[in-house]
Amino acid sequence: MSKECDGKMLFNIKSLMLPLDSITEFGDECYAHLSEDETQKETLTEHTRRCQKYWFNIVEAKHIETVFIKFEQLYMGDITNEARHIFELMSVNVVTLHDIGKINPLFQKLKMKNSWKVEYVPESISSRHSIVSAIFYLDYFLDIINTAKGDGRINRDESDVLKDFAYIYSYIISRHHSDMNNLEYFFSGLTGKNTEGDNSGKDAYDWYEMFKQELYKEPVVKLRKRDEWLNRMAYQSNEKNIYLYAWTRLLYSLLVAADYYATSEFMNGYENNDYGNVNNIDNIINEYENNDVQKSIRNYEKNIKRLDEEQLAKVNKDTVIGNIKGINVLRTEMFLETEYNLKNNIDSKIFYLEAPTGSGKSNTAFNLSFQLLKKSDYCKKIFYVYPFNTLVEQNMNSMEKIFGQKQDIMSNIAVVNSITPYKVKNSSN
């Protein structure tokens, strides 16, 4: 559960993560991956632990627990501690159950070269595992929700909301090897009413029901009606739906990234510790401050008294103050004023800078970004979002002039748009 720490609520993520053997006894009998030469096998338990490790590392490196807490406050509102605990347990363990469907005997036989429980080979879902994992997840957590409601530990409204998340999270799991296309499409497939004929969710449910009944003599939790969930979402505010959309995308991204890193570790023997954060900020700032423009600005800051509004209004192309001339006086004044205002409002979340073209906004933005990285424990990366590719090119050229000789800095700068190839680090990095 979340806990109080120095006045802040924190997800205790590691205590929420379930060991795979608490969910299935088959984690060491079934395999998740084979090496390319098929001489090494990674058990499902080993892969799950790696995924959990990377999931936790990403959350910790990027301080995503603050997003968890904020979403829980804004979306879940005032709920009981038990409902909160179940929500957190469900959220954290998307990564734990995302590949549990690999116990599909046909996946084991065809993909892992492992003849395991071949008497339970499914006929209709082939060797697929993601949709089977989604059904496992649904059954596991719907049972927990129903039990808590039956015991009176959560109320009906809390049960309904938690079930919404169980379906959303199972959808995320079902799509972790593909894109996020359509939740309603997934829901229709679960109930066997998909108009396009893709009822793999229902087929996976039927196989899982047989598998669980044969092995454990236990029933599978019945799925809710499709329209019940959709109608409730339709009456939810747009604001809450935006929160939910962003939350769903975040958990999907976390799962895909953790799965990728974990799989790469097994396949390549490389344990990743680089999550794209800017860790050498002092080196970047030092290099930035050593360029001629910055030296001129800092010299002005040190030796010239700041201009008041009346003096600023009189600045023209012939104005010379110290070693700075014309419009560069205004650029310097804006640079220093924005830096001063930022430092005095460093805990604010949104800043707005408006100035005409040619006034030095790009250089000012560089400086403000670096100041934020330097002052904040939570800022780990800078995104510049531009309306036109020409502006991207201009600002990339500016950065190359400043950092072009420093490969350790330039290697961490990438352009992402429709005309620039993805940046790939070489093997030495």
Q: Residue spans of the language-model regions?
A:
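Acidic/His-rich, divalent-metal-binding segments that scaffold phosphate/diphosphate chemistry
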Residues: 1-121
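An active-site-proximal "capping" alpha-helix that borders the catalytic cofactor pocket
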Residues: 46-59, 127-143
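Conserved Walker A/P-loop ATP-binding site and its immediately adjacent core
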Residues: 379-404, 415-420
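N-terminal accessory nucleic-acid engagement/regulatory domains that precede
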Residues: 1-32, 53, 148-320
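Walker A/P-loop
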Residues: 346-370
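Acidic/histidine metal-binding catalytic segments
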Residues: 64-93, 143-177, 409-412
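Conserved pre-motif I regulatory segment
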Residues: 313-354
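Inter-Walker segment of RecA-like/P-loop motor cores
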Residues: 405-429
